[in-house]
Amino acid sequence: MIVTAIIHLKIKEEVKNKSKYMIAKQLIEPKSIVVVGGSDDIHKPGGTVLRNLQDGNFKGSLYVVNPKMDEVQGIKAYRDVKDLPEVDCAILAIAAKFCPSTVEVLAKQKNTKAFIILSAGFHEENEEGAKLERQIVETINSVGGSLIGPNCIGVLTNHYSGVFTSPIPELNPQGVDLISGSGATALFIMDSGMQKGIKFNSMYSVGNSAQLGVE
């Protein structure tokens, strides 16, 4: 028997006390998304999530940043985030050490308010990674933004498939919202639940829960 409950994204108390923070609309329903680290290789997170965004129901503007490519999966690739236009939501699939500076540019120069960091190598590994994570959270808080992750599989909603997994489960607007620290657990729950007739409206894999977590 699967027990379902109403679960809400919650700001970690230590974060809430330092910033006037609300969950950004750009995370729930972005009008533009950039995949930083997008790849032609669909076996890599940056390749899989880009393919899912294109194959899914995202209707907004989609951008890619890849320093070595002019085009990725048929989309013009920017060599540097500094060259991007303003963008609502950024999905990062790059090495952890590059994430703080990338977030800094997007948040401060590109008016980006929603961040989904797929990359691992943060506080789950060592203190150096924890420091990188804190830098990212501080930057995002300073602009009133939202962060999912790091170290997660992404976000799946009726507006966009920002996850690096396949196949993509079928969603239903009348279903429940699932939030999980573990992406693998979330997918297992969805698969098992759907077999029993449970419908899902969205899935948020919060990973390390550096800013947003589970209440």
Model-flagged regions — what are they?
Residues 5-7, 11-215:
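Catalytic-core regions of core metabolic enzymes
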